[in-house]
Amino acid sequence: MLNESFRPFNQLLYGKSTYRFIKTLYSIYPELKGRVSPSEERSISSNIFEKLPELFFDSPDYEHNIGIYGRENNKRVIKWVSRKIIDDHPNLEKYKVLLPASNGSGAIGEVLSTPLVGEPLVGYTQTFISFGAFDNKKEAEYLLKYIKTKFLRTMLGTMKVTQHNQSKEVWKNVPIQDFTANSDIDWSQSIENIDQQLYKKYNLSQDEIDFIESKVRAMD
């Protein structure tokens, strides 16, 4: 199914540790020194809202205008932080798709836990990873549809044997797609129909299609 022109979807992946604080954070806020280990001082860790609560606010204002998507009290939340203490990132000001850095058990075709489109000026803690850096929201929405396909999750399952989604390695068998209006896939269709287009594009046999359709749960 894969050929010499194959390009992996992981080219669009931004890992769980790619959002970081600036180097001078603890010069600006010396009172925060010692709250986190020296090796993780710039990390926007999964528990950063509890570790450094002074930096984060429940709603945006003129200064605190960057959202950080994370978890608090076992729920997904967005907290707001000053732009001046967040390092530059390729998709901070772009549309992207966020999904958990860990999910499930590694079983082939398992459902991915509630991926979503991330708006510009929203980053994330180490709980999440992201795909893409789009000026056009529609392209991010189409990438989200691709992530929900049975085809993609089957290809992901060929390498993913644990709960971890964050490494490029586990995504290396997933082919990249064109999410623009020039794509050979009609992304405006239902996810079920998109799967049928992908089966045809990659010349899957009827046995392969039957396997995917019987083993892989649909995602809404």
Regions found by a protein language model. Name each.
Residues 1-125, 134-185, 189-206:
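C-terminal substrate-recognition regions of SAM-dependent nucleic acid methyltransferases
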Residues 128:
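Short hydrophobic/aromatic beta-strand or adjacent loop that forms the aromatic wall/cage
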Residues 207-220:
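Short, amphipathic C-terminal "tail helix"
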